[in-house]
Amino acid sequence: MPRWEAAALLAAIVGVCVWSDDPGKVISDRYAVYWNRSNPRFHRGDYTVEVSINDYLDIYCPHYEEPLPAERMERYVLYMVNYEGHASCDHRQKGFKRWECNRPDSPSGPLKFSEKFQLFTPFSLGFEFRPGHEYYYISASPLNVVDRPCLKLKVYVRPTNDSLYESPEPIFTSNNSCCSLAVPRAVLVAAPVFWTLLGS
């Protein structure tokens, strides 16, 4: 392969790598939680999901395809609570109602609620999350229903490298250097290969 073709190929590869390494792109994952007492992850009481900022948590409510007596269908009111409310499974401990799973026999399928973990929300009823913090959800059965276990979920928002909220000490989050050079990783990896191809 002639030298100029190798250089052009390498430049194209580096360009694609740099373009795909754009830090401005928002990449998110979705995590599904099936909120019902038959979900084994709820049985020990330590169900935890780890998310990152911009990820989604999808809560799927109980749903029944076959007809069942109403008293056998699971219905829940989900609350976001503080640590004490999670530990005691008491939504009155600084908790607020988040969602209501109240249509287990809906012909259109299970109710699904989604939580987006974001630093800032444009919605007045939205919730803002901070990296490095834990958030807690519990459910309470409707008042006329007894013998329902307490279902609890802990969500941990992973710290990020560019977050200003993950360290209580500002010295660890501020950039004290007078200048910084932001070089994409792909360029640093490809530079030695490029020089090797040119030298051969």
Curated annotation (Swiss-Prot):
Q: Which Pfam families match?
A: Ephrin (PF00812)
Keywords attached to this Swiss-Prot or TrEMBL record, sorted alphabetically, are: Cell membrane, Disulfide bond, Glycoprotein, GPI-anchor, Lipoprotein, Membrane, Signal
Expression tissues: Expressed in a gradient across the tectum being more strongly expressed at the posterior pole.
How does the annotation summarize its subunit structure? Binds to the receptor tyrosine kinases EPHA3, EPHA4 and EPHA5. Interacts with EPHA8; activates EPHA8.
Q: How does it sit in the membrane?
A: Lipid-anchor; GPI-anchor
Stated name of the protein: Ephrin-A2
BP GO annotations:
axon guidance; bone remodeling; ephrin receptor signaling pathway; osteoclast differentiation
Coiled-coil segments on the chain, per record: none
The molecular function terms of the Gene Ontology recorded here are: ephrin receptor binding
Task: Give me the disulphide-bonded residues.
Answer: C61-C101, C89-C150
Domain annotation Ephrin RBD: ranges: 28-161
Where is it localised? Answer: Cell membrane
